[in-house]
Design a protein with these regions (language model features):
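Extracytoplasmic gate region of multi-pass secondary transporters
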Residues: 37-38, 220-277, 363-368
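Helix-breaking motifs and short loop linkers at transmembrane-helix boundaries and internal kinks
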Residues: 49, 81, 102-108, 119, ...
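Juxtamembrane intracellular "pre-TM" segments in multi-pass secondary transporters
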Residues: 5-12, 195-226
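Helix-to-loop junctions at the C-terminal end of transmembrane segments
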Residues: 69-81, 273-286
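Conserved MFS/SLC helix-loop-helix module at the cytosolic interface between two early adjacent transmembrane helices
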Residues: 68-107
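Helix-loop-helix hairpin linking two adjacent transmembrane segments in secondary transporters
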Residues: 137-139, 146-195
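Cytoplasmic membrane-interface "Motif A"-like loop-to-helix N-cap segments
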Residues: 79-89, 282-296
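Cytoplasmic helix-loop-helix junction between adjacent transmembrane helices
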Residues: 112-151
C-alpha cells in the first residue's frame, strides 16, 4: 500500500517523465546519429573505401550543419516557438536518415549526413527553450541533466544494440529502422509537448531579432564559456563518437560486437554521470568551479590515454572514467542559460551550441587529418602514435580553453541558480 508521503513523489516523477520524455526521445535520435559512426564507421569506411580523413569529415559534417543553423535557429525559436521548429526538423532528419541508408557512394552519403544534421539541429535547443519556458530557472540545470541523461539513450543504442543489428541486417537496414522510429517520435512530440505560446521575441522585426543576437554576444563571460562549450563536448564526441571504435580495434583487436559492448559501458557511465553532474553543481560551489573540476578530470584522463601503456582491461576502465569526467555538460549548458534574459533565451543557448557543434566539427576534422598524416601500418591498422596524437590534441584544446575560462566569475541574477 502506498503511503501518503510516497504518493507526491510518485506523482512528481510521472509528471516529470511525461514532460521530459518526448523531448528526450527526440534528442536521443540526434545523440544516436552523432555517435553511430564510432561503432559502424570502420564498416562504412571499408564498404565505401573511405580514408580516416574522409571518415572524420563524414562524421564532422553533421556538426557543421548544426553550426550553420544555430543563429537562424535561435531567432526562429524566439519568433515562432520551439515546438514548431522541432517538428519541421523531424521531417528533414527522417529524410536525411533515409538518404544516408540508401547512399550508393560517398557524395550521397555526405548529403544524407548533412540533411540529418540540419534536421536534428533544433532537437536539443528547442527542448531547452521549452524547459526554460515551462520550469523555474533554479531547476534548469536539473532538467538539462535529465534531458541529456535520458536523451543519451540514443548514445547507448548507437553502441552494442547498433552493432548487433548491423551484424544481423547491415548498417543500411539499421538506419532504415531509425528513420521510421524518428517519424514515430515526431508524432509523439506533436501530441505530447505543450503548444507554443507567444514569447517576448514573437513580435520583433528581423532587425530587432538580429540586434538581439548582438546583445547576446556582448553578455559578460560569453566568450570564455563559448570556448568551454567548444572544447568540452567535442572531446566526448571525438573519442566515443568517432575514434574509440577504431582504437579498440587497432590496439586491442576487438571486433564490431565487442566494440559495441565496450562503448555501451562507457556511454552508460556517461548517462548516469550526466544526471549526477546536473545535481552536483550546487554542492561543488556553483557553475564555474564545477566546470573547472570536470574539465581538469577530462584532461587528466586524455593525458593518461596518450602517455600510459594500457592493457585491455585498463583501457576499458579509462574509457569509462573519461566518459564520467566529460559528463559535466549540463553545468556548462546551465551556465550558458544563466547569462541571458528570457527574451534572448533561444538566441543565447543556440549561440552557445554553435560553439559546441563547431568545436566537434573542428576536432573531428583535425584528428582525422592527424591520423592520416601519421599513416597506417602495413596491415591497414593505425599505430598507437596516431591515437596518441588524437588524445594530445583534445587535451591541449581543452586545456587552452580552460585557461581562458579560469578568470570567469560565477553569474548572478534571476537565472543564476
Amino acid at each position: 500500500m502506498t503511503s501518503p508521503q510516497q504518493q507526491p513523489i510518485a506523482t512528481s516523477f510521472v509528471v516529470t517523465l511525461a514532460f521530459i520524455g518526448p523531448l528526450a526521445l527526440l534528442y536521443g535520435v540526434s545523440q544516436f546519429l552523432r555517435n553511430a559512426l564510432g561503432v559502424i564507421g570502420p564498416d562504412i569506411a571499408q564498404e565505401l573505401s573511405l580514408s580516416a580523413t574522409a571518415l572524420g569529415l563524414l562524421s564532422s559534417l553533421f556538426f557543421l550543419a548544426f553550426v550553420v543553423t544555430q543563429i537562424p535557429l535561435g531567432i526562429a525559436i524566439d519568433r515562432f516557438g520551439p515546438k514548431k521548429v522541432m517538428l519541421g526538423g523531424v521531417t528533414l532528419a527522417a529524410a536525411g536518415i533515409f538518404v544516408f541508408a540508401l547512399a550508393p557512394g560517398r557524395e550521397v552519403l555526405i548529403a544524407g549526413r548533412i540533411m540529418t544534421g540540419l534536421g536534428c539541429s533544433s532537437f536539443f535547443m528547442g527542448a531547452l527553450a521549452i524547459v526554460a519556458r515551462e520550469r523555474p530557472p533554479h531547476r534548469f540545470a536539473h532538467y538539462a541533466g535529465l534531458l541529456l541523461g535520458f536523451g543519451s539513450i540514443g548514445t547507448l543504442v548507437a553502441t552494442a544494440p547498433l552493432a548487433e543489428v548491423t551484424a544481423w541486417i547491415g548498417w543500411r537496414g539499421a538506419f532504415l529502422i531509425v528513420a521510421a522510429i524518428t517519424v514515430l517520435i515526431g508524432l509523439l512530440v506533436a501530441w505530447g509537448v505543450p503548444a507554443d505560446r507567444p514569447s517576448a521575441g514573437h513580435g520583433e522585426s528581423w532587425a530587432q531579432a538580429i540586434a538581439g543576437v548582438r546583445e547576446a554576444l556582448r553578455q559578460p563571460g560569453f566568450w570564455p564559456l563559448f570556448l568551454m562549450h567548444a572544447a568540452g563536448y567535442s572531446a566526448f564526441a571525438t573519442v566515443v563518437g568517432l575514434w574509440a571504435g577504431p582504437w579498440l580495434r587497432d590496439l586491442y583487436g576487438h571486433d564490431l560486437q565487442a566494440r559495441g559492448w565496450i562503448l555501451l559501458a562507457a556511454s552508460l557511465a556517461q548517462v548516469v554521470a550526466l544526471m549526477a553532474w546536473g545535481r552536483l553543481q550546487v554542492a561543488l560551489g556553483g557553475y564555474v568551479r564545477s566546470i573547472r573540476i570536470g574539465a581538469a578530470m577530462t584532461i587528466a584522463s586524455l593525458l593518461v590515454a596518450a602517455f600510459v601503456p594500457l592493457g585491455p582491461v585498463a583501457a576499458i576502465g579509462l574509457l569509462i572514467v573519461f566518459s564520467v569526467s566529460v559528463a559535466y555538460t549540463p553545468i556548462t549548458t546551465a551556465h550558458g542559460r544563466a547569462l541571458f534574459p528570457d527574451r534572448l533565451t533561444g538566441r543565447g543557448i543556440t549561440l552557445m551550441n554553435l560553439g559546441t557543434m563547431g568545436g566537434v566539427f573542428v576536432s573531428q576534422s583535425i584528428t582525422g587529418a592527424l591520423m592520416d598524416w601519421i599513416g597506417r601500418l602495413p596491415g591497414g591498422a593505425y599505430p598507437p602514435a596516431a591515437y596518441q596524437a588524437v588524445f594530445l590534441y583534445l587535451a591541449a584544446f581543452l586545456g587552452l580553453c580552460l585557461a581562458i575560462y579560469a578568470g570567469v566569475r560565477e553569474p548572478k541574477g534571476p537565472h543564476a541558480r
